[in-house]
């Protein structure tokens, strides 16, 4: 990551919108751990689809996603993943400069994932996930809603993420700046 202080100061940034998965922590290995932990669910979902049809499958998937998949993800993040030092440095620098911060994730359980990473959620003015907005990244409409929740002007906002095609496109869609976190 480029020197955070110079990025924030050069562009007179007043707000930062951080992606969570892949940005605040390195998510490599998480997908494999999820498959190993949840392998037993796959035959159940396939059998249920054949037996009950699409309506029941949608209900099962929603329940499974909220009560099995996401809690498993939070547990694995807490056990095997750590915050990126450069992300912690960025958060600290934003706090020092009085820059408003939001965490905007394509997935749910934002507060729970932050807790699993031992990152204090109270440092952020806004915690939001795409499902609660009803729109996934790179939706400019969703990014605009995040800016509204944060009370931030796009030209004074820096989006930080690990995927240019999602996080970067969302930032550009509202006229905000973007900083790519690379492995």
Segments the model singles out, each with a brief description of its role:
Residues 9-11, 97-99, 150-156:
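Glycine-rich phosphate-binding loop signature in dinucleotide/nucleotide-binding domains
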Residues 88-96, 147, 168, 172:
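Surface-exposed amphipathic alpha-helices with a cationic face
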Residues 3-4, 12, 72-103, 140:
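Short, acidic loop-to-helix structural element flanking the phosphoryl-transfer center
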Residues 156-183:
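Acidic, Mg2+-coordinating phosphoryl-transfer loop and its flanking beta/alpha structural elements
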Residues 61-73, 123-126:
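Short, basic/glycine-rich phosphate-binding loops at helix/coil junctions
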Residues 104-158, 165-166:
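Substrate-recognition "cap/lid" segment bordering the active-site pocket of phosphatases
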Residues 25, 80-84, 115-119, 123, ...:
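A generic "structured core" feature
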